[in-house]
């Protein structure tokens, strides 16, 4: 909103007011989150890009013979939530490392909660190196399906409050 004020001497002053809240800076302990449900279409699209056509992802009988309840979502597809969460809040972030531990299977239709928590940060050459704890949960956030740690280089610590798709 732009407001005009005219003083007695005829001096015009323009003032700008913004309805945007003040910036939130990332600090150690902050948690960013996103939920997602993976579909059969997601599995197919991922396989086309990765060339991972393992029958566990496409054939329910193969999955059952291997000891699973049904077709599996690719673990790497589920873990792609982590860079998505970070880049949604920090445009221009460079994802430099990720460790992953696959704890439990994810099936098509499971609602997955992805969390990244800042556990360390340091400034270097006008950028920030941030280490994150990364976790995905299912079953109403009770069961850890993936955990690990990620490191990203952020251009600044200003967090976008909503991801671009929201």
Curated annotation (Swiss-Prot):
GO cellular component terms, A-Z: mitochondrion
Transit peptide boundaries: 1-17
MaoC-like domain residues: 34-125
Places the protein is found: Mitochondrion
Pfam families named among the record's database cross-references: MaoC_dehydratas (PF01575)
Pathway connected to this protein: Lipid metabolism; fatty acid biosynthesis
GO terms (BP aspect): fatty acid biosynthetic process; photorespiration; thylakoid membrane organization
Phenotype seen when the gene is deleted: Thicker leaves due to enlarged mesophyll cells when grown in ambient air and associated with altered thylakoid membrane assembly and starch granule ultrastructure. Dwarf plants characterized by reduced lipoylation of lipoylated proteins and altered metabolomes due to reduced catalytic activity of lipoylated enzymes; these phenotypes are partly reversed when grown in 1 percent CO(2) atmosphere. Depleted 3-hydroxytetradecanoic acid levels.
GO molecular function ontology, one term from the record: (3R)-hydroxyacyl-[acyl-carrier-protein] dehydratase activity
Primary residence: mitochondrion
Reaction(s) the record says it catalyses: a (3R)-hydroxyacyl-[ACP] = a (2E)-enoyl-[ACP] + H2O; (3R)-hydroxyhexadecanoyl-[ACP] = (2E)-hexadecenoyl-[ACP] + H2O; (3R)-hydroxydecanoyl-[ACP] = (2E)-decenoyl-[ACP] + H2O
InterPro entries xrefs: HotDog_dom_sf, MaoC-like_dom, UPF0336/Enoyl-CoA_hydratase
Keywords (A to Z) from UniProt: Fatty acid metabolism, Lipid metabolism, Lyase, Mitochondrion, Transit peptide
Subunit structure: Homodimer.
This protein's name: 3-hydroxyacyl-[acyl-carrier-protein] dehydratase, mitochondrial
Encoding gene, per UniProt annotation: MTHD
